[in-house]
Amino acid sequence: MPIVDTGSVAPLSAAEKTKIRSAWAPVYSNYETSGVDILVKFFTSTPAAQEFFPKFKGLTTADQLKKSADVRWHAERIINAVNDAVVSMDDTEKMSMKLRDLSGKHAKSFQVDPQYFKVLAAVIADTVAAGDAGFEKLMSMICILLRSAY
């Protein structure tokens, strides 16, 4: 299932949730390294996205990105937001509330182009559980909610 950022997706099944939790656990247990690796992969594959991060200006190589405290800080925030979604899979109202709030911040305060949510979600899905339809469905749920303020 490709990751989508509009419309809706079917609810996650119990089996999908179990598989997501299993795939996510080792990533989150090493969240600092995992988060930086994901964000570096995102920026090296999609350099135009970096323009929305003024603090990352001038960081042009993967090594520079990995060594940046600002990149590490933002990577941790991304990983924690995904973790909140994983933890909240059984409480979609809670997940929706948190992600809609995050959407508002990205739309109004940071003016991020929402197309990049889907690109980053694909990098996360590929890193965590490449080809797993359930994880891609969760990433779609996240992307749809992150676009809600746009």
UniProtKB/Swiss-Prot annotation:
Gene3D superfamilies assigned to the protein according to its UniProt record, in alphabetical order: Globins (1.10.490.10)
Taxonomy, superkingdom: Eukaryota
Alphabetic keyword roster: Heme, Iron, Metal-binding, Oxygen transport, Transport
Residues annotated for heme b binding in this entry: 74, 106
One GO MF term attached to the UniProt entry: oxygen binding
UniProt key word Heme: yes
Stored InterPro entries: Globin, Globin-like_sf, Globin/Proto, Globin_lamprey/hagfish
Residues in coiled coil: none
Domain Globin per the UniProt entry, residue ranges: 11-150
SUPFAM superfamilies: Globin-like
Family to which the UniProt record says this protein belongs: Belongs to the globin family.
Name of the protein: Globin-2
The organism of origin for this protein: Petromyzon marinus (Sea lamprey)
